[in-house]
Amino acid sequence: MAYLAKEERRETIFKAVLDVVAQKGFGGITARGVAAELGAATGIIHHHFESLTEMKCSALLFAAQQDLAANDVIFTQNPIGPALLQILDWRKIPESTSISRIWISAADEATRSPEFDVVYGKAVNDFHAQLSGYLRKGVTSGELKSAIDPDLVAWKLVAVSASLSDFLASDHIAVTGDQVSQIIQHELQESL
């Protein structure tokens, strides 16, 4: 691994962790596997992280922060309706299959590791808060209308989006990507 500043090295490691997670899940992560993905010695992993759990937690936080930043860009560059559809319909995001696999695995890992569960909960709550904030802003500006609290609408939309995206990760569930888009669009129209 070429010389990089400490934060750049950590970011490179996080990306390698997430690449491995997309293939094997968080349960399949080893220091050796991540080092192999990096083309580096395992010492680089042990130098930056005290434990495998710390590395997993840090990588998930990195992924969540990247997702939130990307969502902010989408909301800045698009009207609220198309922006909501774009962030809730994961198929519209490049590498959506990898993203879906990472989040499916994160939910599973949260059941095995109390430390990871805290980080997973923070990531989901932060996404909900971001979405709720945009919904509230849309309701306040008059762009959106909702009979129920935007916090509740945000939870409903997070649940629908995540569940349907999880289904698309399997080649053996009959729902299609177009059907998922239609359902998400319908939920947006019904809720707002």
Describe each PLM feature range.
Residues 50-54, 75, 79, 111, ...:
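Residues in soluble alpha-helical coiled-coils and helical-bundle/repeat scaffolds
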Residues 82, 116-121, 125, 139-188:
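Hydrophobic/aromatic-rich alpha-helical bundle segments in the mid-to-C-terminal region
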